[in-house]
C-alpha cells in the first residue's frame, strides 16, 4: 500500500465555500506541506492542475529541491502541450529529482477552462488525442535510452524524428497515472497507463470500474495497478470526526452550493457527473444525507470540483475502510484534508501505525522514554561531544 498526500496550490482553508480561515498560496506554505509529507513518510504528493492552481511543473520543481524522498505526481495535458516537449520536461525532472517523478495524464473535463486554454475538442476527440499523446510520449522516452528517434502519424498528433537526448532515470519512463470514468477513459487506461485512479465512490461502484479497466487491459495482454483519490477527516473518536466534517461545511449556504453545482453541471466530465449524483445537489447537509456509504461522506463535493468525498471516522475505522478498498485491488491512496498541513500530521500520526507494514516502515523514528521520563518523538540520541 502506498499513501500520497496533496499540495494545495489552489489555496487552503479550515472551511469550504468561504474565505474565512483561508490561507494564501505562497511557496513558504507549500514548502511546509511538502516537507511535512516528506518527513512523515508519505510516498508522494499530488500536484493539482488547472486554471485555479499554480503551474504544477514549476511548483513541483521548486518543492523537489527542498525534499529528500518524496515523489511528485505531476500533470501532463494533451492538447495543451506537445508530447515530445512533455517527454523532455519529464526526463529532466526525473533526473534532477533522482527518479522521483510520476506522471498524471489529465484529459480535462471543464469545457470553459479548456476553451480558455485554446482546446476546442469534444469529449471523444479529447480521448483520441490523449491516447495519441501518450503513445508518442511513451515511445519517445523509451527510445531515448538507446538514442533512437520516433515517427508517429495519428489523427490528431504526428511527429517525425522525435527524440529526447537526455533520458529519464526511470526506465523506460516515469510511471503514468490516469483517471476517468467514461468508456473511452477506461479503454485508454487499459491500453497504456500504469495506475488507474478513481475518485472516492462507494466500494461497489469502485469495484465495477476496476473490473472494467481490468477487462480493457486484458485485451492488450496487460495488467494495471489501481489508486483512489479521497479526502480524510480523522479524529480520535467517531463523534469528533463527524463534528469536524460538519464544521468543514458549517459556513456554506444554499446560494453558494447552488452556484458551485451549476458550474459543475456544465462540465463535460462523467466523473464529475458521478460525484454530483452522490449528494443529489446538496439540498440537505446532514450526515444522514451525505454519508453515502459507511464512513464515506459526500460533503466536500458540495462546492469542490473533482474529488468530492471523504473518509470520516476514528483511526481504526478509517484504516478498516482503506483495507476494504485495498481488497478490491486499490494499491495507492491519494489523500488530502483541510487544512492540509495540520491534517497531514494528524492522519500520519493516527492512521499510519494501523496500516500495512509497507506504510509503517516509512514512519520517522520510534517513540522512546527520555532520561527524565518524558516521551520523545525520535529514536535518535545525540552523542556527547568528544574532547
Curated annotation (Swiss-Prot):
Q: Does the keyword GTP-binding apply?
A: no
Q: What SUPFAM superfamilies does the annotation carry?
A: Bacterial luciferase-like
GO biological process: what's one of them? alkanesulfonate catabolic process
Under Enzyme Commission nomenclature, its number is: 1.14.14.5
| Coiled-coil parts of chain | none
> A Gene Ontology molecular-function term?
alkanesulfonate monooxygenase activity
InterPro entries recorded: Alkanesulphonate_mOase_FMN-dep (IPR019911), Luciferase-like_dom (IPR011251), Luciferase-like_sf (IPR036661), SsuD_RutA_monooxygenase (IPR050172)
Q: Which UniProt keywords apply?
A: Flavoprotein, FMN, Monooxygenase, Oxidoreductase
Q: Which reaction does it catalyse?
A: an alkanesulfonate + FMNH2 + O2 = an aldehyde + FMN + sulfite + H2O + 2 H(+)
Cross-referenced Pfam families = Bac_luciferase
Keyword Flavoprotein in record: yes
Q: What superkingdom heads the lineage?
A: Bacteria
Q: Which PANTHER family match?
A: ALKANESULFONATE MONOOXYGENASE (PTHR42847), ALKANESULFONATE MONOOXYGENASE-RELATED (PTHR42847:SF4)
**Which NCBIfam families has this protein been placed in?**
alk_sulf_monoox, PRK00719.1
Functionally, this protein is described as follows: Catalyzes the desulfonation of aliphatic sulfonates.
The UniProt family comment states: Belongs to the SsuD family.
Q: Name the chain's protein.
A: Alkanesulfonate monooxygenase
Look up and give the organism this protein is from.
Answer: Cupriavidus necator (strain ATCC 17699 / DSM 428 / KCTC 22496 / NCIMB 10442 / H16 / Stanier 337)
Q: Which gene encodes it?
A: ssuD
Amino acid at each position: 500500500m502506498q499513501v500520497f498526500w496533496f499540495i494545495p496550490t489552489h489555496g487552503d482553508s479550515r472551511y469550504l465555500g468561504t474565505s474565512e480561515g483561508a490561507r494564501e498560496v505562497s511557496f513558504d506554505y507549500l514548502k511546509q506541506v511538502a516537507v511535512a509529507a516528506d518527513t512523515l513518510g508519505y510516498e508522494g504528493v499530488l500536484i493539482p492542475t488547472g486554471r485555479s492552481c499554480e503551474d504544477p511543473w514549476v511548483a513541483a520543481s521548486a518543492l523537489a529541491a527542498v525534499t529528500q524522498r518524496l515523489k511528485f505526481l505531476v500533470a501532463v495535458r494533451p492538447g495543451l502541450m506537445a508530447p515530445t516537449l512533455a517527454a523532455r520536461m519529464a526526463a529532466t525532472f526525473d533526473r534532477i529529482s533522482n527518479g522521483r517523478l510520476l506522471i498524471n495524464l489529465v484529459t480535462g473535463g471543464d469545457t470553459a477552462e479548456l476553451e480558455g486554454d485554446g482546446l476546442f475538442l469534444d469529449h471523444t476527440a479529447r480521448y483520441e488525442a490523449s491516447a495519441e499523446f501518450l503513445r508518442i510520449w511513451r515511445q519517445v522516452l523509451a527510445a531515448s535510452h538507446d538514442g533512437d528517434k520516433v515517427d508517429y502519424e495519428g489523427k490528431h498528433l504526428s511527429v517525425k524524428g522525435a527524440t529526447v537526448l537526455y533520458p529519464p532515470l526511470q526506465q523506460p519512463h516515469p510511471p503514468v497515472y490516469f483517471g476517468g470514468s467514461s468508456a473511452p477513459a477506461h479503454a485508454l487506461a487499459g491500453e497504456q497507463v500504469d495506475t488507474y485512479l478513481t475518485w472516492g465512490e462507494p466500494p461497489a461502484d469502485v469495484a465495477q470500474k476496476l473490473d472494467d479497466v481490468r477487462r480493457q487491459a486484458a485485451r492488450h495482454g496487460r495488467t494495471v495497478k489501481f489508486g483512489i483519490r479521497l479526502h480524510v477527516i480523522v479524529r480520535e473518536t467517531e463523534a469528533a470526526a463527524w463534528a469536524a466534517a460538519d464544521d468543514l461545511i458549517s459556513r456554506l449556504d444554499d446560494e453558494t452550493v447552488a452556484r458551485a453545482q451549476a458550474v459543475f453541471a456544465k462540465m463535460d466530465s462523467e466523473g464529475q457527473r458521478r460525484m454530483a449524483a452522490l449528494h443529489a445537489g446538496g439540498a440537505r447537509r446532514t450526515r444522514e444525507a451525505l454519508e453515502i456509504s459507511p464512513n464515506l461522506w459526500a460533503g466536500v463535493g458540495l462546492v469542490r470540483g473533482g474529488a468530492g468525498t471523504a473518509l470520516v471516522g476514528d483511526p481504526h475505522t478509517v484504516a478498516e475502510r482503506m483495507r476494504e478498498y485495498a481488497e478490491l485491488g486499490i494499491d495507492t491512496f491519494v489523500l488530502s484534508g483541510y487544512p492540509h498541513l495540520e491534517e497531514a500530521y494528524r492522519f500520519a500520526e493516527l492512521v499510519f501505525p494501523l496500516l500495512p507494514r509497507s506504510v509503517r516502515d516509512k514512519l520517522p523514528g520510534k517513540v522512546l522514554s527520555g532520561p527524565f521520563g518524558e516521551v520523545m518523538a525520535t529514536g535518535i540520541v545525540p552523542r556527547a561531544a568528544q574532547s
